[in-house]
Amino acid sequence: MPLESVKSTRNTQSYAIWLMPHGNDKHQLKAKIQSLGSDFDGPYFEPHVTLVAGFLGEEKKLLKKTETISKKISPFIIVFDGVAYFNEFFRSLFLKVKFSSQLGAARVLACTELEWKENKYLPHLSLIYGDYTVKQKGKMILSLDSVIDSFSVNNIYLAHNDEINLKWKVIK
C-alpha cells in the first residue's frame, strides 16, 4: 500500500502509547532497525510495540493520562512469535507479538482512559517502515540472524507521531 493511501486513513499528526524495551533488548532491536533502515533506505524509529495510536489531544493532559495508565498497569512480558510482513508502509516487516491477558488488560485500560474506541489491534514490533517488494522483504528476513524473543514492560510512553515527515518523538 503506498504511503499516500496509508496517510489518508490515519491521523498523520497524532499521539500514541508505546511499550518499549530497555537495556540490551533495546540495544539489539535498535541496531536491527538501524541496519535495515540503512540497507533498505527506511526511516529510523525507536523500537516499540504500540498499545494505542492515532489519538489527539493537549499534550499536558495526555501526559497526565499516560501517567495514570502507567500506575494502573502491572509489569508484564511481551513475547514475540516470529517475523511477518504486510503490504503496508507501517507494517512492512515486523515481529509478531503473542497476545496475552496482561497485554489485553493494558490495551483496554489505555483505551478507556483515553476514551479511544478503535477496536482493531494487531500488536507487533516493526523492524522497518516502507514500501518493499516480497523479494526485498525476503532479503530482510534472511538478514535477521537472531532477534530477541521477549522484553519486559515496566513503563509506558507517550509518543508524538509525525507520519508526514516520518518522525517519531518519545515525549515521556
Model-based region annotation:
Residues A84-F94:
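Short, basic/glycine-rich phosphate-binding loops at helix/coil junctions
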Residues M1-I77, V97-S152, I164-K172:
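Basic, often amphipathic N-terminal segments
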